[in-house]
Regions:
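Active-site acidic Asp-centered loop
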Residues: 1-2
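A short, conserved beta-strand element in the Rossmann-like catalytic core
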Residues: 5-6, 125
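Conserved core of the sugar-phosphate nucleotidyltransferase
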Residues: 7-96
Length: 148
């Protein structure tokens, strides 16, 4: 993902290993406290699989704090694994109303009945959407290079 300069490609192995027959699979991690109210951090509402704590189905994505009063909020990491036929299907849909409101393309898939599966990761990646985010990434890179 172009806006995540510090990304562990090993996480992709976990994502790919979870692809089953669903349309789309994506990643989430626990949101930090300061991310919960940040509209640049997309939150995911998930129904977790009863047999696999790290795997679930996305019910909704939002830039707001959803679900209300949750104990844990899930930060959506904008990396997707697609089935080829699902991607072709997705691009055939017009931009949806929820997609326009939230400015989140994955809502187009949900509004059209596509299934988005979610894989939990412990890794937390910094997406660069603002100058503040860029400063965080620069500091992290600087700290990593100083510790080496």
């Amino acid at each position: 993902q172009g806006d995540m300069p510090i990304f562990d490609p090993g996480v992709l192995q976990n994502l790919v290993s979870k692809i089953k027959s669903e349309d789309i699979t994506t990643l989430v991690c626990k949101a930090n406290f300061d991310e919960i109210s940040d509209p640049n951090v997309v939150k995911a509402v998930i129904s977790w699989d009863k047999n696999d704590d790290d795997y679930g189905t996305a019910l909704y994505f939002s830039r707001t704090q959803v679900p209300y009063n949750a104990l844990t909020y899930w930060h959506h990491i904008g990396i997707y694994a697609w089935k080829r036929k699902s991607l072709k299907k997705f691009i055939s849909f017009p931009v949806s109303n929820l997609e326009k409101m939230e400015k989140l393309e994955q809502l187009r898939a949900l509004e059209n009945g596509m299934i988005i599966k979610v894989v939990k990761t412990k890794d937390h990646f910094i997406g660069v959407d603002t100058q503040k985010d860029l400063n965080k990434v620069r500091n992290k890179i600087k700290n990593q290079s100083e510790s080496n």
